[in-house]
Curated annotation (Swiss-Prot):
GO terms for biological process: potassium ion transport. Belongs to the AAE transporter (TC 2.A.81) family. YbjL subfamily. The keyword Transmembrane applies. Keywords: Cell membrane, Membrane, Repeat, Transmembrane, Transmembrane helix, Transport. This is Putative transport protein YbjL. It is a multi-pass membrane protein. InterPro entries: AAE_transporter, RCK_C, RCK_C_sf, Transp_YbjL_put, YidE_YbjL. It is found in: Cell membrane. It comes from the Bacteria. One of its GO terms (cellular component) is plasma membrane. GO terms for molecular function: monoatomic cation transmembrane transporter activity.
Length: 561
């Protein structure tokens, strides 16, 4: 039996799509030196090559892919978007605007200089910024621009061609820039990180290990009684001195949870809860009595929960003001926009921040009720909310504004992005509404992006050979300029206008470019995770601005003549 693979793929769009995805994902795992190609560029390259052989898929799959992707981008940005936009993120907002705005203007200028069409120009901007949201926003706006079908087809083909030719240029140049640009300034990042660590009391260890608290029990001996000198637990401040707190006391056979007025007596058996290193550092006076193994005394349910910050008495306050240790709880992690932040008493909490807290189950529940809610540990997605807001986004995208002879439509990209932001924001405020497990969100977002990349590659593949010969050299120059010049402008603006700490500034610059590999290099250079503060500050707003940039470049282009 002979099977014609070409006929088989041409006759089955679904099979072709998944063949492209599988081959592209395999290619994306390859590395060029220390740089991994990545899933998007792998799928795009494979789809372009197959597109040259005249394979194609239904455009409905491409449209659904980009819609799912951009909606999920909005959902991820939602919890922190408004807090960054309206409150303490002025510097981060300005940096993101400078980065995206300067890249947009430079791309427009180069496009006109080289005589490209809007498709090549927008694709070059998306690739140089390594930003799929730009590609998605531009593609959607082109489809709703009302231009002739032949021009539209050419523009869409050139859009994906420009992206494919400049993506690796943008990625590699930014990674190289992240490695060497910090060395060109007068203050190295490690010094900057240490400086802000001293000012704010930050934990600078980028590789900080997180341990769960453990319980050990001791019998109170004469040295501990002498050390307490009749003071109650509140006056002693056991946690401040030892890193452990007393969770239970057994006295005369009676087990009790002590309050701050309790005074230790000879023969008491106490259960101490703390991290392993805190137990190891205990003063001998606390351990001079015999360690005991009392099952009832040690029988506590220590849990680790992720608490989402929501309540007004926590939002806008500093971590130190929560006084978690006074309530017998231990803070393990602070996560903002999926970025782990340094453990810093002076970090101001935003709505939607996630605190990973360990302690007795009862105490953790009390803390969660005070500052927000415990994140749902469920694998069930609220599909009703997902679908409802998706529909709302599509309806918003249908809105068109008419100005004399000029009409402007919001478009599906902007509509779905806004609807996704609202769903993410409401989810951060209402624990039972719109829940989407992070794994499910990542999967839908990544799948939508890969389907979109496969579609644009297959549709543009037939013209890639001609495109390479005509604009290959120009694309190389333009890609480098659009990738690096906005970074330099952003650095000068942040360093000399905003006067930001360099470690925070470089993190914020990488966040404005939404480039995680470059962020890792900045953290390695600083030998600290402090740049993550800046990265998280600009990341959410930059994703939104980049999508809008893709829309704006298409709208502005006709007016430039």
């Amino acid at each position: 039996m002979n099977i014609n693979v070409a006929d088989l793929l041409n006759g089955n769009y679904i099979l072709l799509l998944f063949v492209v995805l599988a081959l592209g994902l395999c290619l994306g795992k390859l590395r060029l030196g220390s740089v991994q190609l990545g899933n998007s560029i792998g799928v795009l390259v494979v789809s372009l090559l197959l597109g040259q052989q005249h394979f194609s898929i239904n455009t409905d799959a491409l449209n659904l892919g980009f819609m799912l992707f951009i909606f999920c981008v909005g959902v991820e940005a939602g919890p922190n978007f408004f807090s960054i936009f309206f409150r303490d993120g002025k510097n981060y907002l300005m940096l993101a605007l400078v980065m995206v705005g300067s890249a947009l203007l430079i791309a427009l200028g180069l496009g006109k200089l080289f005589g490209w069409d809007i498709g090549l120009t927008a694709g070059m901007l998306a690739g140089s910024m390594t930003s799929t949201p730009v590609l998605v926003g531009a593609g959607d706006t082109l489809r709703h621009s009302g231009i002739a079908s032949t021009q539209l087809s050419s523009a869409l083909d050139n859009l994906s061609l420009g992206y494919a030719l400049t993506y690796l240029i943008g990625l590699v140049s930014l990674i190289v820039g992240a490695r060497y640009l910090p060395k060109l300034q007068h203050q190295d990042l490690q010094t900057s990180a240490q400086q802000i660590a001293r000012e704010r009391g930050l934990d600078t260890d980028a590789n900080r290990k997180v341990y769960l608290p453990v319980i050990r029990a001791y019998r109170v001996g004469p040295e501990l009684v002498a050390w307490t000198d009749g003071k109650n637990l509140r006056e002693l401040g056991i946690y401040r001195q030892t890193g452990c707190y007393i969770e239970r006391i057994r006295r005369n056979g009676i087990l009790a949870n002590p309050d701050g007025d309790a005074v230790l007596q000879m023969g008491d058996e106490i259960a101490l809860v703390g991290y392993p290193d805190a137990h190891a550092r205990l003063d001998p006076s606390l351990r001079n009595g015999k360690e005991v193994f009392d099952r009832d005394l040690l029988d506590m349910r220590i849990v680790t929960e992720e608490i989402v910050v929501k309540n007004h008495n926590a939002v806008g306050r500093r971590l130190a003001q929560l006084k978690l240790t006074d309530h017998g709880c231990f803070l393990n992690r602070v996560i903002r926009s999926q970025i782990e932040m340094p453990i810093d008493d002076n970090v101001v909490l935003n709505k939607g921040d996630v605190l990973q807290v360990s302690g007795d189950a009862r105490r953790v529940k009390t803390i969660a009720d005070r500052i927000g809610f415990i994140s749902i540990h469920s694998q069930v997605t609220d599909l009703l909310a997902f679908c409802a807001f998706f529909i709302i986004g599509l309806m918003i995208g249908m809105i068109t504004f008419q100005f004399s002879n000029f009409s402007f439509g919001i478009g599906n990209a902007a509509g779905l992005l806004f609807a996704g932001i609202m769903l993410g924001f409401l989810r951060a405020n209402h624990p039972t509404f719109g829940y989407i497990p992070q794994g499910a969100l990542n999967m839908v977002k990544e799948f939508g992006l890969m389907v979109f990349m496969a579609g644009v590659g297959l549709s543009a593949g037939s013209g890639i050979s001609n495109g390479l010969g005509a604009v290959g050299g120009q694309m190389l120059i333009a890609g480098l300029v659009v990738s690096l010049v906005p970074v330099v402008i952003c650095f000068l603006f942040g360093a000399y206008v905003l006067r930001m700490n360099r470690a925070l500034l470089f993190g914020a610059m990488m966040g404005a470019r939404t480039c995680a590999p470059a962020m890792e290099i900045i953290s390695d250079t600083a030998r600290s995770n402090i740049p993550a503060l800046g990265y998280a500050g600009t990341y959410a707003i930059a994703n939104v601005l980049l999508t809008l940039a893709g829309t704006l470049i298409v709208i502005i282009w006709p007016g430039l003549g």
